[in-house]
Amino acid sequence: MRKKTIFKGSIAATSAAILAAGLLGTPARAADPVTITIWTFGDVIQRQLVQEYKNLHPEITLQIKKSDLDPLNGTNMVTACTSKTGPDIVAVEVQYSGYWRSYPKCFTDLRKMKTSEANVAAGVPAGKTALDFKKNYLPWRWEQGVGYDDSVMGFPTDVGGLEVAYRVDLFKKAGLPTERGAVGKLWPTWDKFIATGVKYNSKLSAADKKAGKGFIDNAGTLYAAIMNQGTEKYYRNDGTDAGKLIYDTNPQVKLAWNTTIKATEAGIGTRIGQYTSDWNIGMNKGTFATILAPAWMMDYIKQQAPDTTGKWDIADLPGGGGNQGGTQLTVPSYAEHAQEAYDFIAWYLAPEQELKVFKTYGLFPAASVLYKDPALLDYKDPFFNNAPVGKIYSEGVLKVKPIFEGKLQRAIDQAIGAGLGRVAAKKMTAAKSWAQVIVDIKKVINN
């Protein structure tokens, strides 16, 4: 009798377990299909990882919409926030972080989100908020995605660590050192960099000079590099959310302006605009010997000038470390699929994925937990003459000091860039152009 009772109980328990596991009755329903829309620019979202995530989640479609940076982070996002319609994820470039940190209500506060179990098997634990992941990233890069109300708007994708890409063959032809350590010692300061450019240009033939060849692709690129080596830019952190405008009193601004003017007037640049067809052609034909190259630009050079493999190398930036660019992936407050978007970001920007992206596309990780990892430090790039790019860029990034970014930072940058352009085109003297810059900035402030 006892055996019979146990037998019946076992059948009941087993049947319940089978039913619970979905092995009896109606088969378990597959996860509902979801389309995550992503607004981005450039190569922030990499196709290799998109496919990898698709393999993990066949039910999820990642719909990528690329736009130019300024309309994306400007009018497009303003319209989306105002109408409360738009994507599930938006890439916000650091030049716009000061602006959008002023409008945190346009974003989901990722402190209040928790990862689901969707990516546990891929190494992302469930139940984690943004603050649980904060320790993985460079503190100053993390802060660029924090709203003025302390909400977490987004995770950092990369750091635009800045160094000098140079053509070994062209340096040799000009009688300059070619080994990366010796090259870096040529220019401990920006003045020495300019002097090296003058020396390089003096070795060019009359035909090369007539063809517009020069030392650096565009001397105007010195401005941003020098500005980002300071501790302040256009705003001072005075304890308020907005900060105090110091664009007209900060000595770093005039130092960057004056040094860039000096380089321009010394004629070390070719005056070819970056990201133009002439720039791409110039990479292939040796029109210029150096580019101030953030880590993410390495892949661009590879794509545009594949036949120059082994001819390029990477040397230290004058004046110490540097940074140019970087992005946050954010979830708008009106996102239709906020949970799926947050799960994707937590996976996509995990250190493991950031390392893959660096090795494949050159975007240097914002995940500082990798900076002592041999997988990063020992990585060498064959295209760049086997330069230890992991070590070079990590050392440079660690020298960068955090800079307080205000709401109008991008607009002020654009006004100063226009001013430098007028001088380069010989439309104005440096003094008159600077006076016009101040007028233009005041218009932006008062608008």
Predicted regions and their residues:
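C-terminal capping/gating helix-and-loop segments adjacent to ligand/active sites or protein-protein/ligand interfaces
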Residues: 147, 384-442
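Glycine-centered hinge/linker elements that transmit conformational signals in sensory
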Residues: 194-201, 238-273, 302
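Conserved N-terminal structural module of periplasmic/extracytoplasmic solute-binding proteins
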Residues: 2-106, 118, 122-133, 178, ...
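Extracytoplasmic/periplasmic solute-binding protein
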Residues: 144-158, 162-164, 172, 189-245, ...
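Hinge/lid segment of periplasmic solute-binding proteins
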Residues: 96-163, 226, 311-313
